[in-house]
Regions:
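Regulatory cytosolic signal-relay segments
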Residues: 29-88
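Catalytic NTP-binding/metal-coordinating core of nucleotidyl cyclase/transferase enzymes
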Residues: 76-162
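Beta-sandwich interaction modules
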Residues: 3-33
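Short hinge/gating elements
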Residues: 50-57, 141, 191-195
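Helical mechanochemical/support elements of P-loop NTPase systems and associated helical scaffolds
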Residues: 66, 119, 138, 198-205
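A conserved hydrophobic position in a structured secondary element of the catalytic/binding core
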Residues: 65, 95, 220
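Catalytic beta-strand-to-alpha-helix segment of the class III nucleotidyl cyclase homology domain
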Residues: 144-263
């Protein structure tokens, strides 16, 4: 495919320079095509070409931060300390271990801590299997990031299944449960305490959706759930509306459980 654009078709700016107006429709050229710009004047004229959209295969800061190996080895070097990076969209997952406080009281710190630490390994494996990265642990909870919501939902299902199996072979496993919630949107990434961390309304909403879940459940925005073709082992069991702090309107949400745990 060839596209020929005469320089006379471009728009003059002040001072006699020539450039296309930003209001002009974008030029679409087939992959592998060639663009020719013909200058019929005696004077040289600069020509500038720009992509109006990000290249889908570009290695953006957000994309490389989602690689588990990168996050482990050099993630802290991605940003200067205190320098925020605005990302247009990231999917964030929060977990919580139900019953852990009572477990510490009933079996003691050592046994309870071992269960909590071991369950982190279970969650990490499930997250990384779907391209996610554990951003941080907070007490007995995990925050993880994903490039898109489909991966988050599938990881949530894998985590719930793996956690159920883990509890079946772990002392005191019957005393705890796992609940999850996820949400996607824009936020800020900063380097804090030698790791990358996320801040903003998306983080707050994701954490609050997790708070609406019960043991063995994952809570997702209904519109996001409907846009995902493959939910992994998760199956919808309920749709409900809830008022989430910081969000002006009530949200339509989906409550999901693993297929074998979902009611008929």
């Amino acid at each position: 495919t060839e596209l020929r654009v005469p320089l006379s078709a471009l728009d003059p700016l002040e001072g006699g320079e020539t450039a296309t107006k930003t209001t002009r429709p974008p030029l679409r050229v087939a992959p592998g095509g060639t663009i020719y710009v013909q200058n019929t004047e005696a004077a040289a004229r600069p020509v500038k070409l720009e992509h109006l959209q990000f290249a889908s295969r570009a290695a953006t800061a957000l994309a490389v931060s989602q690689l588990p190996e990168f996050a482990r080895l050099v993630g802290r070097d991605l940003l200067r300390p205190g320098t925020p990076l605005s990302v247009s969209r990231v999917a964030l997952l929060f977990s919580d271990l139900v019953g852990s406080t009572a477990l510490y009281a009933s079996v003691g710190d050592a046994a309870a801590f071992r269960l909590v630490a071991d369950h982190f390994d279970v969650l990490k494996a499930a997250m990384e299997a779907e391209g996610g990265v554990v951003v941080k642990t907070m007490g007995d909870a995990v925050m993880a990031s994903f490039p898109e919501e489909g991966a988050l939902v599938r990881a949530a299902g894998k985590a719930l299944e793996a956690f159920e199996e883990f509890c079946g072979r772990t002392p005191h496993g019957a005393a705890v449960g796992l609940k999850l919630g996820g949400y996607a949107g824009p936020c800020y990434v900063i380097r804090a305490n030698e790791t990358l961390d996320y801040f903003g309304q998306t983080v707050n909403v994701a954490a609050r959706l997790q708070g609406l879940a019960g043991a063995g459940e994952h809570i997702a925005l209904a519109s996001a759930w409907d846009a995902i073709a493959d939910h992994g082992p998760l199956r919808e069991v309920e749709r409900f509306t809830a008022q989430v702090k910081g969000v002006p309107e009530a949200l339509l949400l989906v409550r999901a459980r693993c297929e074998r745990a979902a009611p008929p």
